[in-house]
Amino acid sequence: MKRITLLLPFLAAFLGIQAQQEAGSWSITPRVGINSSVLTMDDVYLDVNGTETMKAQHRWGLTAGVETQYQCWSQIALSAGLMYSNEGCQYDKKGDVDEWKQSLHFLSVPLLVNFYIEPDLLPGLSLKTGVQLGYLLQSKETLMGTTNTNTDSFHRVNVSIPAGISYEYRSIVADLRYNIGVTNLCSHKLMDETWRSNSLWLTLGYQFRL
């Protein structure tokens, strides 16, 4: 038992060396994962009296890209990336309302500050926040089995505020972040609505130290 107790500090130090980068170092991390997103669209009325409504539902999509990081100090790092994400929302079929799906294809640049909570006790665990600049590549809607491009109904630029947590073990990086939409994406002239895209990303990456 005493031997195990004596080995624990050395084990913790070993894991810390594997997970924590030195100040002044660079790394690049390709990552891939899934996201759950929704647009803040108005409710759909299910009857003419407007007594029953249906909210937009989350939809699942793919997230993939690459991020580079600079370790400023032991607890602070800055990162920038180029990420693709397929986001949107959907309304399920209910009553006289047909199923409708909205798909948005974004190319985004996340600019983040990463705060490593306690490098000695919790090596590799960090909180992150910053700003994300997105560009809408294409938008498609599916109604009654027919898919049409409706990119003109959306503004191209999407600004969001990401906040998340990540864990690095050796070269494996697990990341969970929530992107809060800031800009109104609705450009439809006949609609006085505010469409913001909120999404939760879960990705797994492999870190290459430069």
Question: Residues of each region from the PLM?
Answer:
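Outer-membrane beta-barrel translocator domains and adjoining extracellular loop/strand segments
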Residues: 40-48, 90-97, 139-146, 186-191
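Short glycine/proline- and aromatic-enriched beta-strand/turn motifs that initiate or cap beta-hairpins
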Residues: 20-61
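Predominantly the C-terminal beta-signal and adjacent terminal strand-loop region
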Residues: 81-83, 87, 151-210
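Outer-membrane beta-barrel proteins
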Residues: 52-56, 68, 99-101, 149-153, ...
